[in-house]
């Protein structure tokens, strides 16, 4: 990946359609200011990592989001599901079609690829939630992230919990 701030974005973006331009503008804004974006999980990708000292972790799993044409990948350790690697991968596979928030952390403009963090978006949500001063008995909007045969993982106010 090249340095984002060294790219000539006007040159790279001059032949984009209006939808592509809007997609990239949102990505640039998230990267520069750390503002969260939202998107639906379209799948889980597994990539082999070269030169890892621990061969049991020579593959990484990523949540994949494709808002329009750009592939946004969230590494397993940035999903927020890191009690155990097996649990993280199992939850990730159950998230197909789930809308999640994320913050762009790296951009590979030439390959239309970005890396993002759900954990950073959750930190922002937690700060915003704390400012609402929730009280016992208040109703709080909750989102179901994944459902398994014996449990459900939900998110509210930047916190994930198992039901």
Predicted region positions:
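Single-stranded RNA-binding regions, centering on S1/OB-family and related RNA-binding modules
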Residues: 1-163
